[in-house]
């Protein structure tokens, strides 16, 4: 469907549904205003896309966001977690709800040829975080216009380092959540057409961890193999033994993954057995307990095989540079609330059930502190080539999603405050 057709259909839906009034007032008004902001949203997103930055080094991205917040008259705290931003809109009093967007790009070379491709070699917004950031800025603009009508406070978290740096953990550590009672986030989804959203209650995304192992032996010439301690054989037998964990120790109805993704030796000579071999990979489970069990068994198998093979094994779980991400588990009450808001916003036919996915997401760190909900927002548009999966150098985003995401964020926040204002008063 062409871009103009999608926008036209959304406008028709807003006009047709506005006659119902009641709870639909907020969503309809937000969607109408967001569609009017589309040109600005596209401009912001393209500026971010052209200048991708990695992990915590988001200086240009952060400066752009702060400039836009200043223009909107929205107050904020900076820096949080090095280059993160926490903005605040509303009364300054409870109830408090948080909205989160990740900002960082990926170390990929963009291979899509278009006027606004990445200007930085080897860096690309291939996971849609530029759009998430833009949607949250769009929500800030929408909410700032209604700040005197907000029945509480909205905190907007612009977070660095989702891609492996556990930026959410560091944002929490530096007080980004404040008094927030709940948090919402979203991610673009190429499996859904633009204009549709996906929801799920309970486990949604996997707990993930990476590991690397160095097995050290004794390296004589290959003509004296009787005197060596061979790390090649030791590593090979260890890798095979690790595969038995999934096939022989885990219920096949449970979602566990253990993948060895690389192996390399400490030498390249044809006639010398290397002194060491390194290998590593990833662990995944739909529960945090599951990943902890996998880590425990990984260590037991590696250490046991090393002892059998007379090698020394050093295991690195990369807790400092790439800590384990908990499982993303959507709160059931927030699931019911979110589905209600999304159906008011776009219509029941646009809200689809999401599938569980074995990807990891550091949004889960927030969910360990307060109830949270993570939404998939569709961007599939075959006519313009918005079909490639995230983390592809050919990833291309349908920018029609930007006003939809902005309105979604804003509607969730205002309606959450509206519903929980009465609870806060009754608890006083």
UniProtKB/Swiss-Prot annotation:
Gene Ontology BP term (one): auxin metabolic process
Binding positions for Mn(2+) 2 per the UniProt entry: 127, 129, 187
Presence of the UniProt keyword Protein transport in the record: no
Signal peptide segment: 1-21
UniProt keywords, alphabetically: Hydrolase, Manganese, Metal-binding, Signal
The protein's enzyme class: hydrolase
Biological role stated in the UniProt entry: Hydrolyzes certain amino acid conjugates of the plant growth regulator indole-3-acetic acid (IAA).
Protein name, entry field: IAA-amino acid hydrolase ILR1-like 3
């Amino acid at each position: 469907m062409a871009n103009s057709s999608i926008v036209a259909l959304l406008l028709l839906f807003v006009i047709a549904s506005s006659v119902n009034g009641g709870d639909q007032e907020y969503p309809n008004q937000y969607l109408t205003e967001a569609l009017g902001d589309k040109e600005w949203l596209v401009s912001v997103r393209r500026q971010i896309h052209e200048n991708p930055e990695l992990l915590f080094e988001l200086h240009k991205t952060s400066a752009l966001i702060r400039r836009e917040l200043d223009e909107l008259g929205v107050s904020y705290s900076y820096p949080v977690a090095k280059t993160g931003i926490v903005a605040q809109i509303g009364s300054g009093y409870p109830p408090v709800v948080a909205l989160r967007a990740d900002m960082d790009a990926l170390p990929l070379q963009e291979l899509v040829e278009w006027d606004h491709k990445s200007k930085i070699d080897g860096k690309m917004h291939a996971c849609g975080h530029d759009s998430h950031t833009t949607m949250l800025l769009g929500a800030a603009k929408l909410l700032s216009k209604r700040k005197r009508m907000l029945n509480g406070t909205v905190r907007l978290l612009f977070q660095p380092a989702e891609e492996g740096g556990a930026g959410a953990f560091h944002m929490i550590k530096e007080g980004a959540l404040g008094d927030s009672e709940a948090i919402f986030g979203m991610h673009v989804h190429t499996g859904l057409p633009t204009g549709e959203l996906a929801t799920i209650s309970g486990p949604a995304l996997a707990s993930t961890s990476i590991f690397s192992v160095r097995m050290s032996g004794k390296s004589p010439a290959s003509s004296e193999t009787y005197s060596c301690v061979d790390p090649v054989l030791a590593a090979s037998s260890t890798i095979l033994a690790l595969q038995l964990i999934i096939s022989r120790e885990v219920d096949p109805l449970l979602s566990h993954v253990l993948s060895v993704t690389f192996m390399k030796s400490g030498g390249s000579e044809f006639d010398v057995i290397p002194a060491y071999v390194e290998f590593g990979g990833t662990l995944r489970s739909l529960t945090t307990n599951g990943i902890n069990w996998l880590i425990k068994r990984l260590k037991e198998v590696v250490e046991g095989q090393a002892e059998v093979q007379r090698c020394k094994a050093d295991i690195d779980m990369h807790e400092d540079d790439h800590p384990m991400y908990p499982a993303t588990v959507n709160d059931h009450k927030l699931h019911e609330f979110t589905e209600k808001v999304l159906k008011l916003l776009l219509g029941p036919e646009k809200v689809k059930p999401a599938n569980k996915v074995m990807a990891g997401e550091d949004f889960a760190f927030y969910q360990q502190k307060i109830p949270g909900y993570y939404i998939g927002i569709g961007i599939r548009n075959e006519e313009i080539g918005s079909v490639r999966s995230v983390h592809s150098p050919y990833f291309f985003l349908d920018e029609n999603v930007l006003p939809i995401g902005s309105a979604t964020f804003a509607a969730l926040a205002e309606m959450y405050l509206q519903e929980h204002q009465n609870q806060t008063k009754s608890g006083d």
